[in-house]
């Protein structure tokens, strides 16, 4: 056999064998206590394997089909790759880039009147309620497999642009230039891919202060699921259109195989540790921080997105909590808003951080879907069965799970203008006595219609062709 061919076979088999071992480490994160998984029960174990497969699905694209010279936007999270308490209202997108180069993003949206604060016509197709692009230096959240990535300075946002500032042509089209600096004669939409920092990198003090973006990511947030349509984005590295990558080689394949396994393992390890240690989701365990933990049926303090929140959309305010309910109990949430955000949403997640079913069941609600009471308070009801009230959130049978409210502001308001949120546990049979008398009754037919709209929207949002 040709020596070169024999070496290729051996190196590829070695890479494959290493990848299988690394995937076994990822699998161990489902049920080995030292890997800090959620408490074991039949459903948590079953969903843990599905959760792992979601990371494997995403890692195929990320390891084998990402090229900063010829980028393509891909789903970072979706109905098949749920995690990190993903927002049921969002398309998460990302692509790797080289921030030293220039890129052009193109899109074409339906009616964008609401981006400029104008009313849209009833019954017409619309752009997503809110869109944001963010260019960042560093790894995607969780890729290091180590909580040290949360330290200030490990990641740097170099620029961002949201739909309140995107200039759109009359036909709905728009372009966005990404570059280390804005060309002097350029007046259009722009995102900077370079930021010079003044503090040394926490793990590499010798690193130069220039931080070039390594990826661009973002969200499309949907409010009116019946009429808002996802936007297809194209991205091109300027000066590189019409080129192709070098022929795929055994060395590249071996590198990609290893990278695939590392992505999966590191994501499993990181998020288990994140929920267990800084968040204290499961109470005090070995290695947790004394006094830090999610109390049940209450919310922690609202925070702006940061490393402490595991990243997140940079314009968001977040709160968090864990519901814990018996079948004869419910949780009534009261959300008071002073300064109207661009977006408000409330999502439920299982203890792996997967969003609860939001197409075939109502595991989330947003500002368009929520009913607001006459006193201006948004009251939501978390319960295991339908209480026949407008703002019901379905636990999908989980006795406990994450509660994740979100409020998005283009400019973060002063803390005294932030919303407030609280929770009260009540007997299921007494729900209506804790709600205003004006609270409507929702019939089974009306609930089915709500779910029909959700099912159709989710199919459109994540269509593959």
Range-by-range predicted roles:
Residues 1-465:
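A compositional/structural signature for long, glycine/proline-rich flexible linkers
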